[in-house]
C-alpha cells in the first residue's frame, strides 16, 4: 500500500540543494580538456565521463555534488581494464616468457609509481578537479592521486568506446616504453633483447668483452652486443655482466627506434 503523503519523509534542505547541484567547468578548464583530447588524439562521445575521471572526491564533497560524480568507480573499472590490456600485450609480445615473469613485469607496469609517471607525462595533474584542502597539501602532484586518475581515465575511455580505443591509446603511450625496457622488474635487458630477436627470427645474438681498463680494485669493462656479427650496442660497467646488460639496453633502444 502506498504510504500516505502525510507520513512521507520530506527531503532536508541540504539534500534538495545537493541533488540540484551540477558540476560546471570554467572556460579555461574546458580548454584544458580540449587540449588533452588533441594531445592524445582521442574523442569522447560522453564528455561527462572524461570530466568525471578527473574529479576527486574532495572536490565533490566541497561542491556538494552527488558522491557518484567522483572518479573512484571509474578508477575501480580502469584498474581491471588496464590489467587486461597489459596482460594481453605481454602474452602476445613475449611468446617465450613464463607466467611468473609476465606477472612480475605486469606488476611493475601497473604499479603506482609507473602509472603516476604516465599521468605526469600526459599532464593529467593540471586537469584534476580538487577540493581546496587537497590542493594546498600538494594533492595535484601526489603520485597516488595521479595513478588513480590514470586508472579512472582508462575506465572512462573503456566505458565510452570499449576496449579497442584503450588498446590504441596504450599502444601510443605505454607499450613503446615496455619495449624500450623502461620496466625491468628484473626481466633483464639481455632477456628482453633475446625475446625481441627470437620473435621475428632476426638471427643470432653474441656478446663480446672488447675492453678492460682500470686497476684491479676499480675495474671497468666494455661489452659489444652483435646481431649476426654486426655490433648493435655497447655498454660499460663495473662487471662483465653489467656491461653486457647495458649493451643490450642500448641495442634495444636502437632496434626500437629503427622500427618506429
UniProtKB/Swiss-Prot annotation:
This is Ribonuclease 3. Transmembrane segments: none annotated. It is found in: Cytoplasm. It comes from the Bacteria. Homodimer. Residues 188-257 form the DRBM domain. SMART domains: DSRM, RIBOc. Its EC number is 3.1.26.3. The gene is rnc. It comes from Shouchella clausii (strain KSM-K16). The keyword Cell membrane does not apply. Digests double-stranded RNA. Involved in the processing of primary rRNA transcript to yield the immediate precursors to the large and small rRNAs (23S and 16S). Processes some mRNAs, and tRNAs when they are encoded in the rRNA operon. Processes pre-crRNA and tracrRNA of type II CRISPR loci if present in the organism. It catalyses: Endonucleolytic cleavage to 5'-phosphomonoester. InterPro entries: dsRBD_dom (IPR014720), RNase_III (IPR011907), RNase_III_dom (IPR000999), RNase_III_sf (IPR036389).
